[in-house]
Swiss-Prot record:
GO terms under cellular component: chloroplast thylakoid membrane; plasma membrane
Protein name: Cytochrome b6-f complex iron-sulfur subunit, chloroplastic
Gene responsible for this protein: petC
Lineage: Eukaryota, Viridiplantae, Streptophyta, Embryophyta, Tracheophyta
Membrane-crossing segments per the record: 73-93
Domain Rieske: 117-213
Amino acid sequence: MASSTLSHVTPSQLCSSKSGVSSVSQALLVKPMKINGHGMGKDKRMKAKCMAASIPADDRVPDMEKRNLMNLLLLGALALPTGGMLVPYATFFAPPGSGGGSSGTIAKDANGNDVVVTEWLKTHSPGTRTLTQGLKGDPTYLVVENDGTLATYGINAVCTHLGCVVPWNTAENKFICPCHGSQYNNQGKVVRGPAPLSLALAHADIDDGKVVFVPWVETDFRTGDSPWWA
């Protein structure tokens, strides 16, 4: 009997109060008529329209402007903790400062201060490799030799595969890229791919007590080849 009564409900009456279907919950109870096993597509479409029309305006999906605002607020919330973690590394990606003349750049430490050799060697033990800001603002390792002196070269930390910054792994005594596993020995020579080339070099000269990076254009002492970066 119920199915017979519902079969006389027309699409135009579906959302009408006269038909007794005036809410979303009531509309969901109305089943489409079936003829030879096939549902009435028109009734289904009308039910969807009725459901959408019955939802209060405040409960509907927000318009594009509101969604964009919510996205911005979400990104801002995520950026707060992330930004704090990136502060120590920010100076390595900042534009290089002035100094060192047209052919060289004074090395900067993680706080953006000039690297003074005597002070640096007091706080960095033999065998350490520490990031500084080098030529063109690139992150560049300063190397303290095993005898406690500063190496005459700096090692560019940008991986030659896809440009990730390669950290120094003290336990393994090599540079290991976290992105795709490329490895370089303690002088930056590539020993395992997918990186195709060794890390670039720069001269680490001393001028007025400060470390100055100068472009390396001579033969790469690690490979005996011309420098690919020059």
